[in-house]
A protein has these predicted regions:
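Oxyanion-binding "anion nests"
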Residues: 272-290, 295-310
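Solvent-exposed loop and edge beta-strand segments that line ligand/cofactor-binding
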Residues: 71-98, 102, 135-155, 200-213, ...
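C-terminal motif of bacterial Sec signal peptides marking the signal peptidase cleavage site
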Residues: 19-22
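Low-complexity, Ser/Thr/Pro/Gly-enriched N-terminal "stalk/linker" regions
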Residues: 25-142, 172-201, 237-238, 242, ...
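A beta-strand-loop signature enriched in Asp, Gly, Thr, and Trp
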Residues: 295-338
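Well-ordered alpha-helical scaffold segments within catalytic/enzyme domains
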Residues: 91-107, 154-169, 215-229, 278-292, ...
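The feature captures the catalytic groove of carbohydrate-active enzymes
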Residues: 61, 65-68, 127-131, 135, ...
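Bacterial N-terminal signal peptides that target proteins for export
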Residues: 2-12
């Protein structure tokens, strides 16, 4: 996520000024689908009757009219960076469209598949290990520079969601692409013994953050579930062990931002909503795929900690992080996805209440009532509105509202 950590602790308008400077089981039957099983999901409503389903569709209409390009890529935003495509923005839209296909709207499949084909432009074909670059021009030229663990890991996760809703050659292509992302993670030198292990954020190797490692853990788990290859299992266990040993803050019950610096490193104890949402999902996957229910408890405890520390009980929304009280659609609504996953596992509707109220706040404060796209930042009371409309924010609001529409 090329722009993400740069933006974490500086104002959004400053971040933008930085510009384009540069996500075999032994003795076990193989699975054909990945992720949390449908058997774990609770009572659903008809998606098409849900106001959230309608809003997800309206969000996609905004994307179609304003963010999608004639090349089948997605521009960064509608104003200041219309000629550039960010890797994780594009793959987030694939992730969003896969969610719509999963709940029954197959009209989204061509958008998903066309952008997947365009993503080849961002792949590092000159390196045997491959891996996605962070950015390119919207026509697919100019991909170069640093490569990011979270970009490649998120890409693999999104492709496995697309794998779940496709068949035949298309399905095989999504699986192979997810494997290629994992191959880059395993063989590009982004994991080393600095700080006792863990993945670097990117090829510059300036920090090791929770979210890069949590997304990698998700990808390895899901590939193990599908393929049964034990090296994916072993990688997931290594990442899990490093996260538990190095990134968990027992004082808050949350995962910290990152480790950087020389020697043993300096831990940065800011807590981010999406970091902890990613870890919640990773633990739920671990519980299911590794048949270890202690990780259900870990996920539930992490959800409780999120709702204690990262939830604003006055405005009923997740904060960006503990050092920044603003709200952003993509990074804050990731918390809703985690709450929906918790509900799917244990049936506690309180999780859905948090997911819904968080989305309701974003719809109230950050949605343009005319064009129905989302702005990128505001303060809790709605002031300080940053009116850029970023592609990734639209993608995540489409995706999470599609997920919620199964239940509310």
């Amino acid at each position: 996520m090329k722009t993400k950590l740069f933006q974490k602790l500086i104002p959004a308008y400053v971040m933008l000024a930085l510009g384009f400077a540069a996500c075999k089981k032994e003795n076990a039957a193989l699975h054909t689908k990945s992720g949390i099983t449908d058997a774990g999901e609770k009572v659903k409503t008809a998606s098409t009757s849900s106001a959230y389903y309608i809003k997800a569709g309206e969000t996609h209409n905004f994307v179609y009219g304003n963010i999608l390009t004639s090349y089948n890529s997605y521009r960064v935003n509608t104003t200041t960076s219309t000629g550039t495509a960010y890797e994780w923005y594009n793959v987030s839209q694939i992730y969003a469209d896969a969610a719509m296909v999963k709940i029954g709207n197959t009209a989204y499949a061509p958008y998903m598949n066309n952008t997947f084909a365009w993503m080849n432009n961002m792949w590092n074909g000159s390196n045997p290990n491959g891996g996605y670059f962070a950015a390119a021009n919207i026509n697919g030229t100019g991909a170069a520079g640093d490569q990011y663990v979270d970009d490649n890991a998120l890409s693999g996760v999104a492709y496995l969601d697309a794998y779940d809703v496709t068949t035949g050659t298309t399905q095989i292509n999504y699986l192979n692409a997810a494997k290629a992302c994992a191959n880059w993670l395993m063989n590009s030198g982004q994991w080393d013994n600095t700080y006792g292990g863990g993945f670097w954020w990117n090829t510059v190797k300036e920090s090791k953050p929770t979210q890069s490692n949590g997304l990698a853990m998700q990808l390895f788990l899901r590939l193990y579930q599908i393929t049964g290859q034990t090296f994916y299992r072993d990688w997931s266990v290594s990442v899990k062990n490093w996260l538990l040993a190095n990134m968990f803050d027992s004082a808050t019950g949350l995962y910290i931002w990152k480790i950087d610096g020389s020697g043993a490193g300096t831990k940065h104890f800011e807590k981010f909503t999406y970091d902890n949402a990613i870890m919640t999902e990773a633990f739920l996957l671990y519980a299911q795929i590794m048949a270890d229910n202690s990780f259900v408890t870990k996920a539930q405890n992490l959800g409780i900690a999120m709702n204690t520390t990262l939830w604003n009980s006055t405005y009923h929304v997740y904060r960006f992080n503990t050092a920044d009280g603003r709200v952003n659609p993509a990074w804050c609504v990731w918390g809703s996805q985690a709450m929906i996953r918790l509900y799917q596992r244990d049936g506690n509707t309180a999780w859905l209440d948090y997911a819904q109220q968080n989305i309701d706040y974003i719809n109230s404060k950050l949605r343009n009532a005319t064009n129905l796209g989302y702005y990128t930042f505001c303060n809790f009371d709605g002031s300080g509105l940053d009116t850029r409309q970023e592609g990734v924010d639209q993608a995540w609001m489409q995706r999470t509202q599609a997920l919620l529409s199964d239940y509310r």
